[in-house]
Amino acid sequence: IASAVIGTSLPCFFPQVRFARVAAAVGVLLMGAFWNSFGSVMHGWHSWIFAAIVFAMLPSGHVRATQSLAWREHYLRAFTVAQAWVMLGYTLSGIFKIAAGVQQMANGQAGSFHPEALSRHTAYRVLEGVPEGSVNIAPWIVEHPYIVWPMYLAFLFIESTAVIVAFRPALHRLWGLLLILIHICIYFSLSVMFSWQIMLVGVLFLCSPIAPNRAVSLREIALKFPLVGDALAWLASRKSSPREQTANGGIPASAR
């Protein structure tokens, strides 16, 4: 444990040195192995280990505007890989929930898309003996299934499309905030705390170096919003195509 703590603390003093970041990756791996060696799996360590390994691949040197274009591209690519990996975990979780819901619907069962899905799952967890904290909204969720149902559908959408957001910097801070709020709600309803994941999402997305260094407008959010923005872009391209053909004598741009 001591060696892991020392290794993970080195980048705090020497973030520009790759050796320090390699030592941190090894330290995180050792800590993850230690905490997962007691008979249960702590999934929160998985993303941290991979992110630490990716950060070890960041180029050496301080982040400055005077760095070469190749250096800055290398830095941004490595950071984007770490972001995409974390979001891929959320997307896989959402897709599995949707796939299970479709299968349950086909079998005539109350699945992920049923209005009482979240309430039933919460009630099941409470019957399992979930420890109650000082604030617990589980009884309210069970008693108001139709109020929380739209929230659960929004949760499925946020999870399933997370990996798309990794490549849309304008949405980094918004999606990071939404994911953190989801984890907080899970804690207050099911007493399952994702503190490690909250910290990682905060570092990678709320503090994303790729996100615009300004306030993002609602129009920009709508144009970048997963599926919605893609549909708007497709409709815009469909509307502009006839105009382009008319301007070019009816000859599409691709045929010229």
Which residues are covered by each model-predicted region?
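Functionalized membrane-embedded alpha-helices
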Residues: 1-28, 53, 81-98, 145-189, ...
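Transmembrane alpha-helix boundary signature
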Residues: 18, 36-46, 58-69
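Short edge-strand/loop segments of extracellular domains
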Residues: 28-36, 75, 113-116, 185-189
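Membrane-interface helix caps and helix-loop-helix hairpins in membrane proteins
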Residues: 33-46, 187-196
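Non-heme Fe(II)/2-oxoglutarate
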Residues: 187-224
